[in-house]
Amino acid sequence: IDPGTLCQGETMATARSNKDYDVIVVGAGPAGLFSAYHLCENSDLRVLVIEKGKAPNKRHCRINDYRECFKCKPCDILSGIGGAGLFSDGKLNYIYKLGKTDLSQFMPVPQAEALIAETEEIFNRFGMDGPVYPTDMERARDVRKKAKRFGIDLLIIRQKHIGSDRLPEHITAMAEHLRNKGVTLHTSEEVKLIRVEDGRAAGVATSRRTYSADHVILAPGRVGADWMGKIAQEFGLGLTQRGIEVGVRVEVHNDILQDLCEVIYDPTFFVQTSKYDDHTRTFCT
């Protein structure tokens, strides 16, 4: 469901019913948070966000204390407000196509670029700003030119690095903003099934109770992919498989990449291998 369509006057007029909420968002990762943000900023719809994990400041992996995985359910690394990326290094890539992600599959490139610019503004609003890379565009272009001589293509991306130590507090600020705008956020509550009436989503049943709503946005994230697949099959929705990218860790001495990474924080080089003709790339440098 496009959250934008829920902000139209006609929808708002009909949304005032005896339902518990106008919109229920399942999952409070990036997709769920941004859906709720768009709705509360552009409408007065009653929005409920349900997240099976915890609040950002309550997410803590016990492996940090005991050096052993306790297989917590739900996992604090993968589940909770902020999604599976809460404890990442907070690297923001402002580009419409990267790896398997290509926004131009869903919209024209100018529209995708406008959406990326809007996304950056929202991140900045909650303090998710940082140094912009490449720090020297001329040097970055020179690196790309040199790489091409060896059959290597460098993708120049506008990047920002937030840092894993700062990301949780910024996501907390975003969640608090949603609450202040009237969005209801439930944590440690798992959606079990979707209620459907007359071919339309009518609400959800959770580990606590049942909620009714005129619209349901499913954004369960990486940890909810299998559940999402089962829901899609249950209601006859089409499913497609995307290719996966398998990575290996290669360590080199800091002196080798330091000069490059001072200009480009996370350089993405593409190489078409000669032996098996595989399309490979570097990431998380």
Sequence positions of predicted segments:
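Dinucleotide-binding Rossmann-like beta1-alpha1 core, especially the glycine-rich loop
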Residues: 80-133
